[in-house]
């Protein structure tokens, strides 16, 4: 199962509790382990892929934060534009896009850093963020 949880803030309340409860996972054990693994990434949303086994034990893999979350943090904005084609909400430099692309590289299916940068730039465009050199 896949969830997106704020780093270091997993607790048994929804959405975490019900999703794990259905699978019969020890919710507190997951929360403690997740919070310990993501404590250094406070403020970001971390996608996590949880594998639950027959005996109700589990493993999980944390992914890199979504590109949109990293772009919002880099641009210092609360949310993207409602009309990205009409009103732009922020501007970020291309080297910042490279940083984000390098961070996201393990989770993107891009062959090169340039291809990853193009993906991140596309996300930025769809959020109303202008990328400049």
From Swiss-Prot:
List the Gene3D superfamilies hit by this protein, alphabetically. Answer: Ribosomal protein L11, C-terminal domain, Ribosomal protein L11/L12, N-terminal domain
Instruction: Choose any GO biological process term that the UniProt entry carries and state it.
Output: translation
Q: Does the keyword Chaperone apply?
A: no
Post-translational modification here is noted as:
One or more lysine residues are methylated.
Q: Which domain of life is it from?
A: Bacteria
Asked if the keyword Transmembrane belongs to this entry, the reply reads: no
A GO term, aspect molecular function: structural constituent of ribosome
GO cellular component terms, alphabetically, are: cytosolic large ribosomal subunit; ribonucleoprotein complex
Q: Which UniProt keywords apply?
A: Methylation, Ribonucleoprotein, Ribosomal protein, RNA-binding, rRNA-binding
* Pfam families (alphabetical): Ribosomal_L11 (PF00298), Ribosomal_L11_N (PF03946)
Name the job this protein performs.
Forms part of the ribosomal stalk which helps the ribosome interact with GTP-bound translation factors.
Against NCBIfam families, the record matches this protein to: L11_bact
* Family from the record: Belongs to the universal ribosomal protein uL11 family.
Assembly description: Part of the ribosomal stalk of the 50S ribosomal subunit. Interacts with L10 and the large rRNA to form the base of the stalk. L10 forms an elongated spine to which 2 L12 dimers bind in a sequential fashion forming a pentameric L10(L12)2(L12)2 complex.
The name this protein goes by in its record = Large ribosomal subunit protein uL11
